Amino acid sequence: MAKAAKAPASFETALAQLEDIIQAMDSGDMPLETALASYKQGTELIKFCQGKLADAEQQLKILENNELKTLDLPNGQ
């Protein structure tokens, strides 16, 4: 029986885990079952990250009176 995956602590943690999965899968040395499990975990991490980004966008809309404005960063960052 498959165990439920624990949600990442943060967006940054999820992104780092996703990068690790991509790097491991790109190596081509992963057995099929491991690759399938990694793919599933990767899709769950992507959904988590998309949710966090959507939440952040919603917070920005609220802060800007429902008008999404361009964020000007100093020094072209």
Swiss-Prot record:
Keyword DNA damage: no
InterPro entries per the UniProt record, alphabetical: Exonuc_VII_S (IPR003761), Exonuc_VII_ssu_sf (IPR037004)
Listed GO CC annotations: cytosol; exodeoxyribonuclease VII complex
GO molecular function: exodeoxyribonuclease VII activity
Keyword entries, A-Z: Cytoplasm, Exonuclease, Hydrolase, Nuclease
EC number of this enzyme: 3.1.11.6
Reaction it catalyzes: Exonucleolytic cleavage in either 5'- to 3'- or 3'- to 5'-direction to yield nucleoside 5'-phosphates
Compartment(s) of residence: Cytoplasm
Biological process annotations from GO: DNA catabolic process
Family per similarity comment: Belongs to the XseB family.
Subunit structure, interactors included: Heterooligomer composed of large and small subunits.
UniProt cross-references to NCBIfam families, sorted A to Z: PRK00977.1-5, xseB
Biological role: Bidirectionally degrades single-stranded DNA into large acid-insoluble oligonucleotides, which are then degraded further into small acid-soluble oligonucleotides.
Name of the protein: Exodeoxyribonuclease 7 small subunit
Organism: Chromobacterium violaceum (strain ATCC 12472 / DSM 30191 / JCM 1249 / CCUG 213 / NBRC 12614 / NCIMB 9131 / NCTC 9757 / MK)
Taxonomic lineage of the native organism: Bacteria, Pseudomonadati, Pseudomonadota, Betaproteobacteria, Neisseriales
Gene: xseB
